[in-house]
Amino acid sequence: MESILITGASGFIGSFIVEEALKRKFGVWAGIRSSSSREYLRNRKIHILELDFAHPNELRAQLSGHKGTYNKFDYIIHCAGVTKCTDKREFDRVNYLQTKYFVDTLRELNMIPKQFIYISTLSVFGPVHEKTYQPITEEDSPMPNTAYG
């Protein structure tokens, strides 16, 4: 059975991805903060992995412990991040820097998955095709109009 780690698994998007991964018969690991709600993660087939992205040494220990027992993940979908905050520097700290810590740690521990998917936000594109509702494509230029995007 292939394994998948879904970070931000207790969030809106992450919890739906967890359910889909279970339907597709993956071994599912839900990467969450210790303070995260587990309300949508009650299925006994879900393995909980507490991850502290804010502290690289702690994150390294958590991932290293997993590797020692289960090896690496086949796939990782990274959707942990903040969508709202009072200080716009928090977006950079959490959504960029902590993601960098995560990827750097995976490399350092030789835990590179077959595929790593980073879930960002439509806010990156700003109001592209807002009136016509045309699909956003790779050719569209990002035009973020908020610190979040």
Language-model regions, residue ranges each:
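NAD(P)H-binding glycine-rich loop region in Rossmannoid oxidoreductase-like domains
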Residues: 46-97, 101, 126-127
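Conserved acidic residues
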Residues: 2, 72-74, 114
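Residues at the starts of beta-strands that form the adenosine-phosphate
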Residues: 3, 27-29, 115
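N-terminal Rossmann-fold cofactor-binding loop
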Residues: 31-36, 52-53
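Conserved Rossmann-fold NAD(P)-dependent oxidoreductase catalytic core, especially the SDR/UDP-sugar
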Residues: 100-146
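N-terminal Rossmann NAD(P)H-binding glycine-rich loop of SDR-like oxidoreductase domains
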Residues: 4-24
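SDR active-site strand-loop-helix element
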Residues: 7, 31, 76-80, 116-122
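Short loop/helix-cap segments at secondary-structure boundaries that form the rim of catalytic
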Residues: 37-44
